[in-house]
From Swiss-Prot:
Protein's UniProt name: Phosphoglycerate kinase
Keyword check for Nucleotide-binding: yes
Taxonomic lineage of the native organism: Bacteria, Pseudomonadati, Pseudomonadota, Gammaproteobacteria, Enterobacterales
Transmembrane regions listed in the UniProt entry: none
Keyword vocabulary terms for this entry: ATP-binding, Cytoplasm, Glycolysis, Kinase, Nucleotide-binding, Transferase
Location relative to the cell: Cytoplasm
Family: Belongs to the phosphoglycerate kinase family.
Pathway: Carbohydrate degradation; glycolysis; pyruvate from D-glyceraldehyde 3-phosphate: step 2/5
Any GO molecular function: ATP binding
Binding residue positions for ATP: 197, 314, 340-343
Amino acid sequence: MSVIKMTDLDLAGKRVLIRADLNVPVKEGKVTSDARIRASLPTIELALKQGAKVMVTSHLGRPTEGEYNEEFSLLPVVNYLKDKLNSPVRLAKDYLDGVEVAEGELVVLENVRFNKGEKKDDETLAKKYASLCDVFVMDAFGTAHRAQASTHGVAKFADVACAGPLLAEELDALGKALKEPARPMVAIVGGSKVSTKLTVLDSLSKIADQLIVGGGIANTFVAAQGHNVGKSLYEADLVDEAKRLLGTCDIPVPTDVRVATEFSETAPATLKSVTEIKDEEQILDMGDVSAEKLAEILKNAKTILWNGPVGVFEFPNFRKGTEIVARAIAESDAFSIAGGGDTLAAIDMFGIADKISYISTGGGAFLEFVEGKVLPAVAMLEERAKK
């Protein structure tokens, strides 16, 4: 990967705009999982230490584009950064026509999705971002698969566009896992976004020795085996695709599950066989027998790619499957890479961050990289490095 790296530049006195991935869960004005901010801190601190005029920005959540909405403000992130850096951090709301930043100061530019044209990679907006800085640092691997104004367009127009340390590290770690993985390689794909991940399963089936499915994806495979899945989250129109995958590769489908009659934190869990699911029930976790079977597979792996929990781990009664799988990954000797927002939250919950070889901040980008797709923001950095 031939890109300019931030670590090769002298940033002293320069206006530096860092596009980080600070899209973290927030509850009642407080950050509830700080993994992505923690991952971005070294980049921010490096720029501050060099005496740069540092601006950092990100998206957070899915606000209506072009409209300010306090619920999606980066203020909780600013408060977190003040605390962690033990220094003042300003939040700039109106910054597109310029913002004053002192050397060694950090200013957070409000949620990029409050700007009209962000998602469409609007050229006028991209040029405004570019005019704010002397050096643009793309450090948000999690959004590198999206060609948007703050990830792709700005890199096209900034005087200098480079990769931040986190982005460079992510690409190196994923490259290592995918180009020459130690075998056997096990890939776990879980979570609730089913359709976006079934295509990934196809790509992974060609490089992984063993595929594991969980969450909403597993429900589609349970349905593909002819079982009733009741009110479970699954994709009826992808059942044939799941059948095809079952025919071409070895995918262990859950044989026992935890179900409930409502999707709620307090719903009692019933453990049962996949052959006994009633119309009014929904699968919210895999059962112990299924989870332990996966743990056994993970024990013998040499490379593990993990994207997505295997159940609704946010609900205490439906946490056990994900916990069994997470602890098996933590205890494995394999080179393990975990990616995706829900996966990071699960890692935090079970306190196993130090037992995972590499934690990727990307969700969709992680999966697209795994699929071998070109990430637009990275492609733009490569193009700029040639000039």
